[in-house]
Amino acid sequence: LKCFQHGKVVTCHRDMKFCYHNTGMPFRNLKLILQGCSSSCSETENNKCCSTDRCNK
């Protein structure tokens, strides 16, 4: 799962996660657009939470 950073680099606080929104199609190249930082990021089919801005958990 690859993440493509949009815009400038964003940093989050230690207790927060980078929240991405999945704009890709299933079983194809997924593009995750950075939505912002959140302390309560819930992962769903269309959302992904990462501990870094590059989605490297």
From Swiss-Prot:
Q: Which Pfam families match?
A: Toxin_cobra-type (PF21947)
User: What pairs make up the disulfide bonds?
Assistant: C3-C19, C12-C37, C41-C49, C50-C55
> A single GO CC term, please?
extracellular region
Query: Could you confirm whether the keyword Secreted appears in this record?
Result: yes
Per UniProt, what is one GO molecular function of this protein? ion channel regulator activity
Q: Where in the cell is it found?
A: Secreted
> In which tissues is this gene expressed?
Expressed by the venom gland.
Q: Which UniProt keywords apply?
A: Disulfide bond, Ion channel impairing toxin, Pharmaceutical, Proton-gated sodium channel impairing toxin, Secreted, Toxin
Q: Which InterPro entries match?
A: Snake_3FTx (IPR003571), Snake_toxin-like_sf (IPR045860), Toxin_cobra-type (IPR054131)
The misc remark on file is: Negative results: has no effect on rat ASIC2a. Has no effect on rat ASIC3, rat ASIC1a-ASIC3 and rat ASIC1b-ASIC3 channels, as well as on TRPV1, P2RX2 (P2X2), HTR3A (5-HT3A), Nav1.8 (SCN10A), Cav3.2 (CACNA1H) and Kv1.2 (KCNA2) channels. Does not produce motor dysfunction, apathy, flaccid paralysis, convulsions or death upon central injections (intrathecal or intracerebroventricular) in mice.
What family does the database annotate? Belongs to the three-finger toxin family. Short-chain subfamily. Mambalgin sub-subfamily.
> What functional role does this protein have?
This three-finger toxin inhibits ASIC channels. It acts as a gating modifier toxin by decreasing the apparent proton sensitivity of activation and by slightly increasing the apparent proton sensitivity for inactivation. It binds more tightly to the closed state and to a much lesser extent the inactivated/desensitized state of ASIC1a isoform of ASIC1. It interacts directly with the outside surface of the thumb domain of chicken ASIC1a (ASIC1a), but does not insert into the acidic pocket as suggested previously.
- The protein, known as: Mambalgin-2
